[in-house]
């Protein structure tokens, strides 16, 4: 898969950040500006895309509590919007959206998550609508 655009919501230092990606993307900024958090978000999304929300959150510093947007304890949902294609040779774009939260005070070894919105769209056609799933 080739990611064209990656939007992060309520993840670490990023309240709402969207970046355009090209074959070579350079991130430049001050210490504490969110460069490493962006890579953590990409890793988190990668684990989600492999099939298990539980894999996306391990022990601290990658626990859900440690990774949700740090400026507000009231924000509970983390989300990603991703525009991607199979490859540069197959440029048809897919749009994937997921918003989720951890439910209650979870057992660190077996947390429970709630997906509020998940969809995969191809040229405006919704391929996989979903929401309200407890995992």
What are these regions (language model features)?
Residues 1-14:
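N-terminal pre-Walker A segment at the start of P-loop NTPase domains
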Residues 9, 22, 83-85, 101-103, ...:
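Solvent-exposed residues in well-ordered beta-strands and their adjoining turns
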Residues 31:
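The conserved Walker
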Residues 27:
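Hydrophobic anchor at the beta1->P-loop junction of P-loop NTPases
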Residues 89-135:
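Electropositive, glycine-dotted interaction segments
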Residues 16-22:
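Phosphate-binding P-loop
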